[in-house]
From Swiss-Prot:
Its main location: membrane. The gene is TMEM225. It comes from the Eukaryota. A motif (RVxF) lies at residues 219-223. The keyword Cell cycle does not apply. This is Transmembrane protein 225. The keyword Transmembrane applies.
Length: 225
């Protein structure tokens, strides 16, 4: 069975969350998520869900909900990476509540991003029947789905870290109770020892008293003679 420490889990968690943030920022700067193709296949236009103004092939700006969800996912990813970094450098306590919070944050950020991508695909299919003939997905779109995977892995790692810390706490409590039992047994033995050692002392003292009495009696006899 492979043993994984908490520090290695925290390091992998920071690595995956950092990659998720980097790819999200890269997706904001690059606007070639999808290539829209017109009906005569002459006009081609790049499109991204981060665009505030829509191109001529897609005049209606109905991606406000998608942008809000992707913005919330980006903000939560930044917050997750910050908390994981502070926890790795011991700036915040490493308890199960922080680990549960990072787990919820990871899964919620991944679900928000996945839901935004599904909505964006739905809008592309709706626009295909009205504004353009077809579209082609580029590699940036696949990196967005890779971000969903990274955030899900962060949630699983946070759950694993919480489980390991909980099991280690129970083992420490059991070890502490065993030590307390051993200390109590030792104290009982220490208390019972003086009672056993007191008996020979009393015998020795009685013997000395009897010997003194015999000496006194012999002295009295000699003086009488």
């Amino acid at each position: 069975m492979v043993h994984v420490s908490n520090r290695s889990i925290q390091g992998m968690n920071i690595l995956f969350s950092s990659w998720a943030v980097v790819l999200m920022v890269m997706g904001i700067t690059l606007d070639k998520w999808v290539e829209l193709i017109s009906e005569d296949e002459r006009a081609k236009m790049n499109h991204s869900p981060w665009m505030m103004c829509c191109p001529a092939l897609w005049p209606e700006d109905d991606l406000k909900v998608v942008r809000i969800m992707m913005t919330s996912s980006l903000g939560l990813s930044f917050l997750l990476n910050l908390i994981l970094g502070m926890k790795f450098t011991y700036l915040i306590p490493q308890n199960k509540y922080i680990q549960l919070f990072t787990t919820i944050l990871s899964f919620f950020s991944g679900i928000s991003l996945l839901w935004a991508l599904i909505l964006y695909h739905n809008k592309l299919k709706q626009g295909q029947s009205m504004h353009f003939s077809s579209y082609r997905i580029t590699w940036i779109m696949y990196t967005a789905y890779l971000n969903v995977f990274f955030l899900s892995v962060c949630g699983v790692l946070s759950l694993l870290e919480c489980k390991l810390s909980t099991s280690s706490c129970t083992c420490l409590n059991i070890h502490k109770s065993d030590n307390e039992c051993k200390e109590s047994e030792n104290s009982i033995e220490d208390i019972s020892l003086p009672e056993c050692t007191a008996m020979p002392r009393s015998i020795v003292r009685a013997h000395t008293v009897n010997s003194l009495n015999k000496k006194v009696q012999t002295r009295h006899v000699t003086w009488a003679l």
